[in-house]
Amino acid sequence: MSRYQCPDCQYIYDENKGEPHEGFHPNTSWNDIPKDWACPDCAVRDKVDFIFLADSPSKETQLGVNSQLANSESGISDATPTGMAVLAAELVIPLNQENKNEGCAAKTEVLDQASTPQVVRKSSTRKKMRNK
């Protein structure tokens, strides 16, 4: 079954779901919808303006994804975008925390070393010039 999207409001007609409010039962083919049918959200009149998106996932595909999720330890398959994001976050967050702690200590030391001697040098230079 296929899906079609309205170009104005992005409403999606899914043949698997149909549009019960419009009188189209689930599994109503796009070809069975009258040509003068209007988008239920924004009333675009021309059915031909709708954009073909793709075939809807079949029940077999959905079952395959569900079993893949059930078999993974975390409940999120590593092959999905969400799974990849979770993996990346697990790797990056500890590194960032270590770098932040090291960076703060290093910056504090540099500031302490740079600011204190400069003040002393300027004041000692002024004192020497006054004494002459």
UniProtKB/Swiss-Prot annotation:
Basic residues composition-biased segments: 123-132
Transmembrane domains' residue ranges: none
Pfam families associated with the record: Rubredoxin (PF00301)
UniProt subcellular location: Cytoplasm
Induction: Induced by AlkS.
GO molecular function: electron transfer activity; iron ion binding
Pathway: Hydrocarbon metabolism; alkane degradation
Cofactor, how bound (note): Binds 1 Fe(3+) ion per subunit.
Domain Rubredoxin-like residues, every copy: 1-53
SUPFAM superfamilies: Rubredoxin-like
The protein's role, per its UniProt record: Not known. Probably involved in an electron transport pathway, but not required for the hydrocarbon hydroxylating system. Seems to be non-functional.
Family, per entry: Belongs to the rubredoxin family.
Protein name per the record: Rubredoxin-1
Organism: Ectopseudomonas oleovorans (Pseudomonas oleovorans)
